[in-house]
Amino acid sequence: MRNVKAKCRPKDEKAVFLPYQQKWCDDRSRIKLVEKSRQIGFSWATSNDLVAQAIRTDAKYDFWVSSRDEIQARLFLQDCKKFADGYEKFIKAQSGVNVYTDEGGKPYTSFDIKFYNGIAIHSMTSNADAQAGKRGTRVLDEFALHPDPLKLYSIAYPGITWGGQMAIISTHRGSQNFFNKLCEEAKFNGNPKKISLHKVTLENALDQGFLFKLQNALPANDPRQDMDETDYFNDVKSKCADRESFLQEYMCEPMDDASWFLSPDILEDCFYRYGEAWQTPIDECTGSLYIGVDIGRTHDLTVIWVLEKLSGILF
């Protein structure tokens, strides 16, 4: 370990996980949820936990990972593979047993990892309907950023009927998002779903050794090497777009949607999903076409866009 400037250090400096990560991984409640700061290692720690569960001899069902888009889910699976490689190396050296399945060919793809006991970890599309018909533990990563969190929860929950747990991981995305409604229900309305609720702000993470871990991972010439926890906290805060975004992204305080001229739900309905076709060839247009131009005179880009008028609406 380096001689770093961080003052808050974990009790066991060589431990892989910080206390809040370990507490999350040790929680075997049927439904657990964490409202968290950005980039404090929850998805990474959860990927190790999935592998540790999947390679057990008594594992019964597969594990399903859904994130806000397919790319993010595959990145989660890449972390799973790194941990699985570590388990494979250690266990094989100790007992000669393979962790991965031994069927010839690669035991993993971009979408799944297969283990010796027939259990697999799968990455999934963000489409909530993909949750149907699948049994076992599911991780709903970046939950509030999914296209439809309410639908995702509704279809994912029945999948743990025969065993496993549902782990919901997210930063907030507005006070009216279903993620925040789950948090408020658990805190203030009797917790009817019996959710095991975790909350870790940036301040909480720093108190438990986050900066110590970060500085040991950063290059020696990174300017954050000269910071203590107070310096780092203030640096992050000062670089956020505004106070409200800092509170939401790092302090688990959702933005008040009532202050938005257009609500996040309305804006999200206007987004094209990843992989969704959005361009129409000009020769296939049947309505009148309108062109708009916004000229960037100094540092901004010039933008040109074409819209088609159908039934009185421009698309």
Where are each of the predicted segments found?
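Metal-dependent catalytic core segments for phosphate chemistry
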Residues: T286, I295-F315
